[in-house]
């Protein structure tokens, strides 16, 4: 769903930042 998509994006950003 859309929430899962947001979670995926947030996770990707977190991986890039860290």
Swiss-Prot record:
Top-rank lineage group of the source organism: Eukaryota
GO biological process, one term: defense response to bacterium
Disulfide bonds listed in the record: none
Modified residues annotated as Threonine amide in this record: 18
Tissue spec. comment: Expressed by the skin dorsal glands.
Keywords: Amidation, Amphibian defense peptide, Antibiotic, Antimicrobial, Secreted
Keyword Cytoplasm: no
GO cellular component term, pick one: extracellular region
Subcellular location: Secreted
Pfam family, one: Antimicrobial20
Chief localisation class: secreted
Role summary: Shows antibacterial activity against B.cereus, L.innocua, M.luteus, S.aureus, S.epidermidis and S.uberis.
Name recorded for this polypeptide: Maculatin-2.1
Source organism of this protein record: Ranoidea genimaculata (Brown-spotted tree frog)
Lineage, top ranks: Eukaryota, Metazoa, Chordata, Craniata, Vertebrata
């Amino acid at each position: 769903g859309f929430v899962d998509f947001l979670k995926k994006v947030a996770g990707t950003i977190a991986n890039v930042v860290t």
